[in-house]
Amino acid sequence: RLFPSMTVLENVMVGRHCRLKSGIAGAILRPPSTRKEERKVVADSYRILEKMDLEKFVNEYAQNLPYGAQRRLEIARAMATDPFILLLDEPAAGLNPSETDELDELILKLRDQEEVTVLLIEHDMKLVMSLSDRIFVVDYGKKIAQGTPKEIKNNPAVIKAYLGEEIDA
């Protein structure tokens, strides 16, 4: 969750702090190395905001952003940690179709340009099919299928579970 009373920039900087080398002593004494590191955090955060198309909101409070921009900010903060794997749990929930399309483009861009693996948990099947190389389908806590989007789209167990159609035995 976002920190609603912090700015967009501050929210991303929070994600970046896990990569800092200076500890409590550095925060208190503020040697040149700590100040240099803090400047780098700010610069890195601006770079991330530009990639997420959020730079226009840099000084805006997170709570004042449109819902789709808040979702992008959550992803921006996660990306600030320099992850190898980005876990997205229903990132399209509550988004309108236009915002979902923008999210689709953003996740593809992150996957391809930032070379981050994306683990997506999502009910929007159009988004899942668009983004995924491999899909694991779970129904009531049990894996019922796995495969490529094409294989999943035509899988009788998936069709039955999600569309309610009968499987011919």
Feature names for model-found ranges:
Residues R1-A169:
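Glycine-rich phosphate-binding loops of nucleotide-dependent enzymes
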